[in-house]
Amino acid sequence: MGKIIGIDLGTTNSCVAVMQGTQPTVIENSEGSRTTPSMVAFTKTGERLVGQAAKRQAVTNPKNTIFSIKRFMGRKYDEVPNEKKLASYDVVNEGGYAKVKIGDKTYSPQEISAMILQKMKQTAEDFLGEKVTEAVITVPAYFNDAQRQATKDAGKIAGLEVKRIINEPTAAALAYGLDKKKENEKVAVFDLGGGTFDISILELGGGVFEVKSTDGDTHLGGDDFDQVIINYLADEFKKQEGIDLRKDAIALQRLKEAAEKAKIELSSRTDTEINLPFITATQEGPKHLVINLTRAKFEAMSAALFDKLFEPCRRAIKNSKFDIKEIDEVVLVGGSTRIPKVQALVKEFFGKEPNKSVNPDEVVAIGAAIQGGVLQGDVTDVLLLDVTPLSLGIETLGGVMTKLIEANTTIPTRKQEIFSTAADNQTSVEVHVLQGERPMASDNKTLGRFHLSDIPPAPRGVPQIEVTFDIDANGILNVSAKDKATGKEQSIKIEASGKLTEAEIEKMKEDAKAHAAEDQKRKEEIELKNSADSLIFSTEKQLTELGDKLPADKKAAIESALEKLKEAHKSGRVDAIKPAMDELSKVWSDAASNLYGQPGAEPQPETNGHAGGSKGGDGAVNAEYEVIDGDDK
């Protein structure tokens, strides 16, 4: 049985971890980093870049570089007007859902997220040396059903069986509390990431991690603080030069990178200089942006964002039934909690110094890996009791939302209620499933609708319709309605906003596999071309050194084969390069057999581009060829 990995699929960065024995390990990616930018780019040649490679070229390719895709997961097009404005790429309306358009192709947010998940999967496979097929993936605690389902679909597309979707602050609490022995510790997890904010109140003790309440804002995170700085820089430059840099995609991407860098610097310094030479040009010549930003100015500009953090905290504490003074620890999670003002406000609100013992960028992935260990049986004596973040119910007479499951109910859970018809002789009912806290159905999120028909005609209020809500451990909902008189039942697995059909998921999985195959093929092609290049170089070098020792016919054959390989290499055609390399290798082999044993003789280059010689020959020859091999590289 393979390992179940833990993935923190973040708005800005993603992270992967796995249990090694009884300890979780964060895995470094191929670039040597423990976190990977949640970015995907498509180059002009059609190559797909993920992670750091995508981030590096974002300034020169803003239209085709996708970032913060998590903000679009499971969302309808009309739900993301602000997110759409902040994207440098095209967000389009396809069937009412937000999708990304690159060239003439559209991608769902699930597909883009799957590309990031594939990168995390590959990172884990490289580390473990084995195939990975199962994962625990984290989501913001305040993600609704549609967003959770979209995350699960992304995992499927990436070739992962998602064993569990768990809430980010809950995962962080698992990582924080795994080795804690204190009984009944009340912990607040304050999780401010790149795109979302969550606050969860938990009680930890005896290996039980019980979430008492959760709240948050899925539209608040580090990106919003970056945007404050972007707007300030753009406004200041407009005052100075009369040019709005927000209308230039490349300039805007440079502003975005500079804003993120400035925000990070202001966490350890009281001021920073933002210097962007050649940001734009006019008829008078190039224009440069040089602006000084103080921490005090940044904090003043971000005041409204800071204020938004604490209303969810008040609600979460109230719903937990704890007094704020009872909270033993406040654990900071998410990169944005490094902002000094956030830390100061958290201390002021909770009346205690926040706990910074966990790495805010890695702790969620570590918690996901621990949950993977629990599911696998490697971690025992840990019980996780999570909650549903939002109330669930159905629309009843008068357009009212009637709640069946209240927010912050421990999951998994099941709830049944009896409803009846609203009119005489009504033979069918529509079950309109809703999620949210507002009293009117129209103000809440529709998760799905289905009909129960063939109800025997009867006066209103007589038929008994039993509605059952069933939430699994992933927080995903199943609803059924049953006519108690006839036993007729209708059910629906909520497949809400942005939910993909099995056929769509299968197609996307095949596309993802094809892309992986294409990437591998491209890599092999590049390696072959590099080998050919190396072989050309070493052949020319040895012709210069050994030319006068070769018989004229052998030398001519080598030169002819060398020219053929050069032409094939120039054409870039793999089907031409390989035979040309084989031919050159063969004629070198023939020539080497004549030369072998002559003073100063050296064997031929090998087809893989590494010079090499016959074993059992002069040891000095072999040593000399090792040096040539090093030069070739």
From Swiss-Prot:
Phylogenetic placement of the source organism: Bacteria, Pseudomonadati, Chlorobiota, Chlorobiia, Chlorobiales
Classification via Gene3D superfamilies: 1.20.1270.10, 3.30.420.40, Actin, Chain A, domain 4, Substrate Binding Domain Of DNAk, Chain A, domain 1
UniProt biased composition (Gly residues): 610-619
Name of the protein in its database record: Chaperone protein DnaK
This protein's record includes keyword Chaperone: yes
Region (Disordered): 594-633
Positions of transmembrane segments: none
Listed SUPFAM superfamilies: Actin-like ATPase domain, Heat shock protein 70kD (HSP70), C-terminal subdomain, Heat shock protein 70kD (HSP70), peptide-binding domain
Record family assignment: Belongs to the heat shock protein 70 family.
Inducers of expression: By stress conditions e.g. heat shock.
Positions carrying Phosphothreonine: 196
One Pfam family linked to the record: HSP70
